[in-house]
A protein has these predicted regions:
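Dinucleotide-binding Rossmann-like beta1-alpha1 core, especially the glycine-rich loop
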Residues: 1-70
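Flavin (primarily FAD) binding-site architecture
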Residues: 147-162, 307
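C-terminal catalytic lobe of FAD-dependent flavoproteins
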Residues: 79, 86, 92-94, 102, ...
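Short coil/turn segments at secondary-structure boundaries
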Residues: 6-7, 21-30, 60-64, 99, ...
Length: 438
């Protein structure tokens, strides 16, 4: 996937520029054993990695001696040195909602809790039929349909008479969240005897994120969940590298996602890692109407993928403008990455009753929109009810009015990650308040 890697590496600097509040640099450490032939190939790979990336604000790969390093505090003694390379972290749930907010601001109609149940030809247009969580049926006319349903892409295609031979392989990836394992902000890139790679990543300041597995997921009717086997696999993987002995009791939370990998002619590969992570855009005409399906794709290249989709559809929208997303920040991202600490200090100076953790969280979630959220706040009392862990009425109101939030899970997991900290009593307090608010 040389093309995909090149595109993703070039894209990192763009993402750091247009969304510096939810995307930031991260250094990854690869522990190595002495005199292993794999060390040479890993170093060659990293040299190519840096070369493909070209000029970047991210630092290049370096080598460190672990025996005289603080990194060696928990690593087993057999690991004597390490390579350290650069990549980026993206707050994925914030990325999704900020794109939706931006689209709405530019004229899009965002329908949450609404699913497509059918579509049909109506004259020279598509008629898309939807059903929301209240059972209401709505119909929409459009020139073309873009099937960007991710793991549900094949389900949507079943509504058509499509003759394409493309499909998706559903691969479940599970993650574990444990209390912070290290007192630094480096991530670990770990390789196993089975050829798989596991990451240990600093997560939400107080935790470490461990993942991910790769397991075939049969269909989306089955809710993806981290199995006991996956938990054992990840814990054993980590324990082979570090002196501590993580057990299931150390797991604070676990979650699973499903990746829809592109598959041609329903190819079945037992090795999930061998299936491409690249995306394929398939434009076809069904009853003489354009229908474009997106297969596969990665989070890193979401912007390029979206621009390529519109480029393919330009003939149907002759008034479409030129590409613009590279130069336009997502909501709250109108500052430079090196200005982030200064922005936190500015927030604290204007609102001295916000503690350090809350100020950091606001800038990491909302960027410059933090000042819009708090514009009418003059004192701590103006924040309203405190539901716990610095989540107050003023923030929840913003999420309800501006970020399409409707439920406790929306607020604690899909807009923030405060669900990691909230206990049952705090959740109930928030839920009871929402009953009177919505």
């Amino acid at each position: 996937d040389f093309k995909l890697v090149k595109e993703a590496l070039k894209e990192r600097d763009v993402l750091l520029k247009i969304m510096p509040h939810i995307c930031w640099p991260m250094r990854f450490l690869i522990p190595l054993q002495s005199f292993k032939i794999n060390n040479f190939f890993i170093r060659c790979g990293l040299l190519i990695y840096d070369y493909i990336a070209g000029y970047s604000i991210l630092p290049k790969t370096e080598t460190t001696n672990l025996q005289n390093s603080s990194f060696n505090a928990f690593l087993k003694s057999k690991f004597t040195k390490a390579y350290i390379y650069s990549d980026c972290w993206v707050e994925d749930s914030r990325l999704v909602v900020l794109n939706a907010i931006d689209a709405k601001k530019r004229g899009a109609n965002i329908l949450t809790r609404t699913r497509v149940i059918n579509f049909e030809k109506k004259g020279k247009l598509w008629n898309v039929i939807t059903k929301n969580n209240k059972g209401e049926i709505h119909e929409f006319l459009c020139k073309c349909i873009v099937n960007a349903a991710g793991p549900w892409v094949d389900n949507i295609n079943n509504y058509t008479r499509s003759k394409n031979t493309f499909s998706t392989r559903l691969v479940k990836g599970s993650h574990l969240v444990v209390n912070k394992l290290f007192d630094h902000n480096y991530a670990f890139f770990l390789t196993g005897n089975d050829g798989r790679i596991i990451f240990v990543i600093p997560f939400q300041d107080e935790y470490s994120l461990i993942g991910t597995t790769e397991v075939v997921h049969q269909n989306m009717d089955q809710k993806p969940m981290c199995s006991d086997e996956e938990k054992d696999y990840l814990l054993n993987f980590i324990n082979n590298y570090f002196d501590f002995n993580l057990k299931t009791d150390n797991i604070i939370s676990s979650f699973s996602g499903v990746r829809p990998l592109y598959s041609k002619n329903n190819q079945k590969s037992k090795n999930m890692s061998s299936i491409t992570r690249d995306y394929v855009l398939n434009l076809e005409f069904i009853e003489n109407l354009p229908f474009l399906t997106i297969y596969g794709g990665k989070l890193t290249t979401f912007r390029k993928l979206s621009e390529n989709v519109l480029s393919r559809l330009k003939d149907f929208f002759p008034e479409m403008g030129s590409e613009w997303t590279m130069k336009n920040s997502l909501p709250g991202g109108d500052f430079l990455i090196h200005e982030k600490k200064e922005l936190v200090l500015k927030l604290q100076k204007k609102y001295p009753f916000l503690d350090q953790i809350c100020s950091n969280r606001f800038i990491n979630y909302y960027g410059t929109l933090s000042f819009e959220i708090l514009k009418n706040v003059k004192s701590k009392k103006d924040l309203g009810k405190n539901f716990g862990h610095s989540l107050t009425e003023i923030e929840v109101d913003w999420l309800l009015k501006n970020e399409f939030a409707k439920s406790v899970d929306d607020i604690l997991w899909r807009r923030t990650k405060l669900g990691l900290k909230f206990n049952d009593s705090e959740k109930n307090k928030l839920e009871n308040w929402l009953k009177y608010k919505i």
